Amino acid sequence: MANFTAADVKRLRELTGAGMLDCKNALAESDGDFDKAVEALRIKGAKDVGKRAERATAEGLVAAQGGALIELNSETDFVAKNAEFQALADQIVAAAASSKAADVDALKAAKIGDTTVEQAIAELSAKIGEKLELRRVAHFDGTVEAYLHRRAADLPPAVGVLVEYQGSGKDSDKEAAHAVALQIAALKARYLSRGDVPEDVVASERRIAEETAKAEGKPEQALPKIVEGRLNGFFKDAVLLEQPSVSDSKKTVKALLDEAGVTVTRFVRFEVGQA
């Protein structure tokens, strides 16, 4: 008996853009495991699987201040453009910076004047008549460069990046860190270095590369080289230090940072509506 429902099939279809029968078969083959089903659909070549599977349904904004980055969600972009909503986000990110909250629960308990962040969100939600949600927060203690990107001039920032870095204290350090923040915002790096990629992710990408190559009819003896080439392509896309720089495509981000004498220690990227 299948351990998934019609609703599960619908959800997988919405996440991946694959056909209904393909989604049903993928869930059956994976015994109802969504991650395995997504992997199976990627092997079969479903369009936009990797990108659409990360998408969440939300509007809202991101805000940054003093080493803190938050995402505050609303149900509609109409509310996201609301001045009171944006003012609340500014208060919340200020509370995140001062309290150094490590997670959403800690930030909800932080104070905004005489009330808590959680209470302030609930009060504005009741006033506006729309569900509001503090989705996530990040805080870095070191030297930080922040970048916020708007999708349109009339909308609040929807993409936020924090880059923690070390340098020699020159003005050029900040310029290099800012360039990296722009890079992360645009090319959506997921990991800092190759060593930061989880082993299960590497294993999954290797399986996908191998099965896809087999499905394409590639010679058996050529598979190892093809798989390694495609895996290196994955690293080049997902790993910040291995990406070609947007400012000089002939050099990697690592090469430009080395030239600037700057070391990125960690980063985070929030995008409204993305996992």
UniProtKB/Swiss-Prot annotation:
PROSITE patterns for this protein: EF_TS_1, EF_TS_2
Keywords associated with the record: Cytoplasm, Elongation factor, Protein biosynthesis
GO MF assignments: translation elongation factor activity
Superkingdom, natural source: Bacteria
Primary subcellular site in the record, as a coarse category: cytoplasm
Compartments (UniProt record): Cytoplasm
SUPFAM superfamilies recorded: Elongation factor Ts (EF-Ts), dimerisation domain, UBA-like
Cellular component, GO, one term: cytoplasm
Region (Involved in Mg(2+) ion dislocation from EF-Tu): 76-79
PANTHER family (UniProt xref): ELONGATION FACTOR TS, ELONGATION FACTOR TS, MITOCHONDRIAL
Family indicated by similarity: Belongs to the EF-Ts family.
Functional description taken from the UniProt entry: Associates with the EF-Tu.GDP complex and induces the exchange of GDP to GTP. It remains bound to the aminoacyl-tRNA.EF-Tu.GTP complex up to the GTP hydrolysis stage on the ribosome.
Protein name stated in the entry: Elongation factor Ts
Organism: Mycolicibacterium paratuberculosis (strain ATCC BAA-968 / K-10) (Mycobacterium paratuberculosis)
